[in-house]
């Protein structure tokens, strides 16, 4: 199908395209189109095992773009993807009703492990997992540091907090996980210039374990 037909504003895909355009305002048209198609494939398949998986099961059926185009935009395109977090913060803060503007917002930092069955993946390593259920406290895989924004909203006349993921970054051991988390927090803090109460929560876990021999946080 043509791009014009696919992005018709009267269709669900067209409305999704309009919504995500705010994330791609500074990108070239081809790059923005490729990134949106990737997002659309993830939403459709509810999974993202790999770019090849997305291409074989969805993308190849709706676009003439090659698989390499999608690899390129994720790996080599000169795009500052960290700005996506700032855009998400701005959108999320608009969800706070006027009556709750003085309530605190929370930035929650955590880490998560993703196991890998191979050993030749980039940055894969043996990681300590305090929540492992495989008979060992270690797994072979990747570690990601995440930041989530929680904002107050009304839910049946009670204050409830809506949780919105802002971003994930792979820990590559070039810096500590806390330093990685701090860089993500610094990235989004300018968006909170109008907020007086911002609470940063660090989820206790492997992210903040001490190396006994080195006496420092890892």
Regions found by a protein language model. Give the residues of each.
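Conserved, well-structured functional cores that handle cations and Mg-NTP chemistry
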Residues: 1-218
């Amino acid at each position: 199908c043509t791009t014009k037909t696919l992005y018709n504003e009267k269709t669900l895909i067209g409305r999704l395209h309009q919504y995500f355009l705010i994330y791609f305002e500074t990108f070239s048209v081809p790059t923005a189109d490729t990134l949106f198609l990737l997002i659309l494939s993830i939403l459709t398949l509810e999974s993202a095992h790999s770019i090849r998986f997305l291409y074989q099961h969805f993308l190849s059926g709706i676009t003439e773009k090659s698989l390499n185009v999608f690899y390129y935009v994720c790996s080599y395109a000169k795009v500052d993807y960290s700005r996506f977090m700032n855009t998400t913060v701005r959108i999320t803060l608009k969800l706070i009703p006027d009556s709750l503007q003085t309530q605190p917002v929370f930035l929650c930092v955590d880490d998560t492990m993703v196991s890998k069955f191979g050993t030749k993946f980039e940055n894969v390593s043996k990681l300590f997992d305090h929540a492992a259920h495989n008979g060992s406290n270690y797994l072979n895989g990747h570690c990601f540091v995440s930041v989530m924004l929680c904002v107050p909203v009304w839910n049946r006349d009670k204050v409830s907090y809506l949780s919105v993921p802002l971003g994930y970054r792979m820990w590559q051991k070039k810096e500590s996980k806390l330093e990685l988390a701090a860089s993500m927090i610094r990235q989004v803090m300018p968006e909170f210039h109008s907020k007086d109460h911002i609470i940063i929560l660090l989820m206790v876990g492997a992210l903040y374990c001490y190396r006994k021999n080195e006496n420092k946080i890892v």
